[in-house]
């Protein structure tokens, strides 16, 4: 075995988790190696050519506020942007961008290759080296050894990946890539528990063979949007998508061939994603539905490949052609890449600490689909946190852990390490108890200061953040201190604004509270200073939802007390009398960081928590 080099951090994988992990560790000053199966597929988007959407966009905004890369990349390579859920409250507003996937890859590769302290190599890792419970490095298929103080697993869907299309299956990764066939065994040999999951992707079709006039045009917003708080608000609406639907004939073809689908024939062992079902799943599970919605989306500005969103399948090619050609707009479609299902190994995430470190192997971290999640955004968020925590661990500092009340990233990681998952985990706004506090628009106000303390928020971002914060404070003070008296002129002005008259003197702040008014309307009417749209939006939301926000903050204060009660790492819960056998087993397996985390474990009752509180109090008194 030939020793090539030694690094502070080695990141295994060059997907969305790997990119953020490697960038974070390197930017925090640690010599880092990214080991990827293919240099040509760094930050590959093997499924939908898009970033964001409900719940997912919140992760991207948070990642950006902490100093991550995905938001900047998504903005720079977007070809269409839409703000979803605008008919609902601001807690669930979600930005989604259609990406030029090729440009996205190229820009991320360029960023990786030009980051100080970061090397990237095309390497197939076959073995993880561990000595005395501590990671020491990796071995490649060519017999090379790379030493490392910390290793981050970002293996995606490449561990023993298997492609399934109808009756055919073969070893392979997304887009026909190689897979890591032997690395799973090395993880097992080191006591790491693996699961088998499955996901899938639709066919890519040739735009030249589509009848676009038979589909509805789906345009982007004309409003200014961006994921990154560093970005200028510019219009990104270069391309359109198309909307179409399946029909009775489509469903009949799928139903009559359902026995040829690997999921139904028994060929697939892995568990698939609940919230991204295949078309055959949808047809079977929702047999009463006459049609299912599809979006036909461009994969970029320099290709004719189109992504058929909503048509993930693993049916054979002849069936794929047959049912696609029953759909309006796809009557003459030609498939450029087939739809397929992919099975892969991943870690049981309950083996991880909230810092994403494997509990029984010092210096080993894991992030992304390797932890049982689905989606680029979930992967990137975990990658950033794993990279940060590996760097902090090397520096002898406390881990960086976000609470559920602080970020969707905190919700994501807490769900994984506390509850685990038996299917690919997808982030949704409904998973958070504090949705109104964790909006995408205020991610910078919540997290930029934390990113600054860590060292990922540089001076330019910090200057922008402090200027915005000062502007919000200034606007709020101005509204609170601007009197509005019930004069005839004022009453006439209010009537012209379509709002009720006032009986006594109030302040401009009280007017902004009214549903039909906003900061912009009040400012123009009363000659107040105007601000940038993001500042005015923050002011509007803070004032309109003031009462609800206060209620959630009170809830957070109550929960925080339990989160601050840290449990000793050395406790053997089987020796604690008064808690149930199930609680003892679950607590010993998950080894929660705090009383708060323990209270969220399935099988740990309020009575068990009460016993733990008493035991912890006695333990702390005896120290």
Language model region names:
Residues 3-17:
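Beta1/beta-strand and adjacent pyrophosphate-binding region of the FAD-binding site
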Residues 431, 448-453, 457-610, 614-623:
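Extended, charge-enriched "interface" segments that sit outside catalytic cores
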Residues 12, 145-156:
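Short hydrophobic core segments
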Residues 379-400:
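Internal hydrophobic alpha-helix adjacent to the cofactor/substrate pocket in enzyme cavities
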Residues 6, 23-127, 142, 154-171, ...:
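Conserved N-terminal/central alpha/beta ligand/cofactor-binding core
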Residues 38-40, 83, 185-321, 418-491, ...:
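An anion/pyrophosphate-binding glycine-rich loop and adjacent beta-alpha core
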Residues 307-373, 401-414, 532-586, 591:
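A glycine-rich dinucleotide-binding beta-alpha-beta segment and adjacent secondary-structure elements
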Residues 129-145:
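Conserved beta-strand-loop-beta-strand element in the redox core of flavoprotein oxidoreductases
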């Amino acid at each position: 075995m030939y020793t090539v080099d030694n690094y502070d951090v080695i990141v295994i994988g060059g997907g969305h988790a790997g990119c953020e992990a490697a960038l974070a560790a390197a930017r925090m000053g640690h010599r880092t190696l990214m080991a990827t199966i293919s240099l040509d597929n760094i930050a590959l988007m093997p499924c939908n050519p898009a970033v964001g959407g409900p719940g997912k966009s919140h992760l991207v905004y948070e990642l950006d506020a902490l100093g991550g890369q995905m938001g900047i990349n998504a903005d720079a390579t977007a070809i269409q942007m839409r703000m979803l859920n605008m008919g609902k409250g601001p807690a669930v507003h979600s930005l989604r961008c259609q990406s030029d996937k090729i440009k996205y890859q190229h820009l991320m590769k360029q960023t990786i290759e030009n980051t100080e302290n970061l090397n990237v190599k095309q390497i197939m890792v076959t073995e993880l080296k561990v000595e005395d419970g501590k990671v020491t490095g990796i071995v490649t298929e060519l017999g090379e050894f790379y030493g490392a103080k910390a290793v981050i697993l970002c293996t995606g869907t490449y561990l023993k990946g298997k492609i399934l299309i109808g009756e055919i299956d073969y070893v392979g990764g997304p887009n026909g890539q190689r897979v890591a066939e032997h690395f799973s065994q090395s993880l097992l040999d080191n006591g790491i528990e693996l699961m088998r999951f499955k996901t899938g992707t639709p066919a890519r079709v040739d735009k030249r063979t589509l009848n676009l006039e038979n589909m509805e045009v789906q345009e982007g917003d004309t409003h200014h949007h961006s994921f990154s708080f560093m970005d200028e608000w510019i219009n990104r609406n270069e391309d359109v998508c198309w909307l179409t639907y399946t029909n009775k004939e489509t469903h009949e073809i799928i139903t009559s061939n359902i026995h040829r689908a690997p999921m139904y024939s028994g060929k697939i062992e892995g568990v698939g994603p609940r919230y991204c079902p295949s078309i055959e799943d949808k047809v079977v599970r929702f047999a009463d539905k006459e049609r299912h919605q599809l979006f036909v989306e461009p994969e970029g500005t320099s290709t004719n490949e189109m992504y058929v969103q909503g048509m993930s399948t693993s049916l054979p090619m002849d069936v794929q052609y047959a049912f696609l050609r029953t759909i309006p707009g796809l009557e003459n479609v030609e498939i450029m890449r087939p739809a397929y299902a992919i099975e892969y190994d991943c870690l049981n995430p309950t083996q991880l600490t909230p810092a994403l470190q494997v509990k029984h192997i010092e210096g080993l971290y894991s992030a992304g689909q390797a932890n049982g999640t689905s989606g680029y955004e979930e992967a990137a968020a975990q990658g950033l946190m794993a990279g940060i925590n590996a760097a902090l661990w090397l520096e002898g500092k406390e881990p960086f852990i976000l609470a559920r009340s602080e970020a969707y990233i905190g919700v994501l990681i807490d769900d994984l390490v506390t509850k685990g998952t038996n299917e690919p985990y997808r982030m949704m706004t409904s998973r958070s108890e504090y949705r109104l506090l964790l909006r995408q628009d205020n991610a910078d106000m919540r997290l930029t200061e934390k990113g600054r303390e860590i060292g990922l928020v540089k001076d330019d971002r910090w200057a922008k953040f402090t200027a915005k914060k000062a502007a919000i404070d200034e606007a709020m003070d101005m509204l609170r201190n601007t009197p509005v008296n019930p004069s005839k002129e004022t009453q006439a002005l209010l009537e012209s604004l379509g709002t009720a008259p006032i009986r006594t003197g109030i302040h401009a702040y009280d007017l902004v509270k009214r549903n039909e008014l906003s900061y912009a309307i009040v400012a123009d009417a009363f000659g107040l200073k105007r601000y940038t749209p993001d500042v005015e939006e923050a002011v509007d939301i803070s004032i309109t939802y003031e009462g609800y926000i206060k209620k959630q903050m009170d809830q957070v204060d109550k929960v925080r007390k339990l989160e601050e009660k840290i449990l000793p790492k050395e406790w053997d819960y089987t020796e604690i009398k008064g808690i149930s056998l199930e609680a003892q087993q679950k607590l010993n397996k998950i080894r929660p960081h705090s009383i708060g985390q323990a209270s969220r474990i399935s099988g740990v009752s309020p009575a068990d928590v009460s016993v733990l509180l008493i035991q912890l109090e006695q333990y702390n008194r005896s120290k």
